[in-house]
């Protein structure tokens, strides 16, 4: 059974992180972890995983609008394998199409005074997690 969950919006410069749980099927943005050409700051990610101790990790898979792989898809898959090996958690991949667009829309809708990349990436991770929870 799922306990707490972590979702990751993988990116080459930043990785958005959200937490959630299946009972209420709600997600909350945690923040972002810096990445350097797709390699995350593992020390920061280690701290987040240790603190939240998720049973499962959901990672957004960047596909195009027709569900074809993009230039970053392979990097995201490699990252997912590394996350699974590093944390020994079940990792689920889910199409993240439109998650960033949805995150930007939510920030604009709620009149967020400053739409920063940090807010967008963490909120995109929420969208990924909410989508996964609604399908499982």
Curated annotation (Swiss-Prot):
EC number(s) reported in the record: 3.1.-.-
Entry function: Could be a nuclease involved in processing of the 5'-end of pre-16S rRNA.
GO molecular function: nuclease activity
This protein's GO CC annotations: cytosol
Species of provenance: Francisella tularensis subsp. mediasiatica (strain FSC147)
Name this protein carries in UniProt: Putative pre-16S rRNA nuclease
Record's keyword terms, sorted: Cytoplasm, Hydrolase, Nuclease, Ribosome biogenesis
Upper classification of the organism: Bacteria, Pseudomonadati, Pseudomonadota, Gammaproteobacteria, Thiotrichales
Localization in the cell: Cytoplasm
